[in-house]
Amino acid sequence: MAKLTVKDVDLKGKKVLVRVDFNVPLKDGVITNDNRITAALPTIKYIIEQGGRAILFSHLGRVKEEADKAGKSLAPVAADLAAKLGQDVVFPGVTRGAELEAAINALEDGQVLLVENTRYEDVDGKKESKNDPELGKYWASLGDGIFVNDAFGTAHRAHASNVGISANVEKAVAGFLLENEIAYIQEAVETPERPFVAILGGSKVSDKIGVIENLLEKADKVLIGGGMTYTFYKAQGIEIGNSLVEEDKLDVAKALLEKANGKLILPVDSKEANAFAGYTEVRDTEGEAVSEGFLGLDIGPKSIAKFDEALTGAKTVVWNGPMGVFENPDFQTGTIGVMDAIVKQPGVKSIIGGGDSAAAAINLGRADKFSWISTGGGASMELLEGKVLPGLAALTEK
């Protein structure tokens, strides 16, 4: 990577500002999935082991007005992080002001402080989300000229807590997580070991147009599953019953199929049901067509076999988006089948692009079989699309 990383700077005795991604799910104040906290530990531990004083910034959920602050405090995260680090985490519970400044100035080498949810600053004019220059400058002033960005999940956003701080420090560097995310995803797309197969699922073609276009140029094959299958089907005149379709994207789907030169591989059958919820009948279709009064909710057994064949011998696989409504056991067979087809390839570099695919791999017990699972759905999508991420662009060049 052509950007400075945390290993390129002297941290001893320095107040080091760190953007992490602690945007974790909370239920009644309890963290229900701590993966993002765990993912940030190597960078935090490195900073404190080097004698730095880690000052952490993160958002949590969306905060638009004062009432939204309830249930969006990072207090439970501070407690969880302290337990994981085996040391106290200072948590002043504010995003600015004398109390925060005093707590930061009282830090000793090897200590950790967590600033309150950066999006609390969005209540007054969206200062965080709109990258207010004064806020970025203020937060930068709390440190000693070093900023570590380890929040891949927000790298596609230009916020005060990443791009804003970067613009006001001497050195803005990548943390280990950000470095790994970029290395795995960018290298897979730009310099893959071939054959390179991309698998795209999810419900909407509109979410993935740019990704499909970019991957058709880079990959050897692009497999399509999930709800967007039916927009591609309808574009070819195939009956789709009551399946999800984006009528305004039929021309786009048709154009992608024409451009693909046979690289785009669609399912050849579906698992269909007579309703999305409260269905009384589930069955496999004979071929591509979905029956009248039914909707396709997963790829069928013939498609799983076809995708398995398409993946044979693959050396690089990037997967983004489930094959069906995997949260429902009746419609998770396709996602499981594709996951198993990926991970059984000898010597394959397998990457999951965050979001629902990551949730599927974790929930269905296959997370440890993949080379890399991205922590950022939106950011990984933009990398797959070939876009420049603002949070990455703002870092100091080597």
Curated annotation (Swiss-Prot):
Family: Belongs to the phosphoglycerate kinase family.
GO molecular function per UniProt: ADP binding; ATP binding; phosphoglycerate kinase activity
Catalytic activity field: (2R)-3-phosphoglycerate + ATP = (2R)-3-phospho-glyceroyl phosphate + ADP
The keyword Membrane appears for this protein: no
Organism: Streptococcus pneumoniae (strain 70585)
Alphabetically ordered keywords of this record: ATP-binding, Cytoplasm, Glycolysis, Kinase, Nucleotide-binding, Transferase
Subcellular location: Cytoplasm
Metabolic or biological pathway, per its Swiss-Prot or TrEMBL entry: Carbohydrate degradation; glycolysis; pyruvate from D-glyceraldehyde 3-phosphate: step 2/5
Gene Ontology BP, a term: glycolytic process
Superkingdom of this protein's organism: Bacteria
Protein name per Swiss-Prot or TrEMBL: Phosphoglycerate kinase
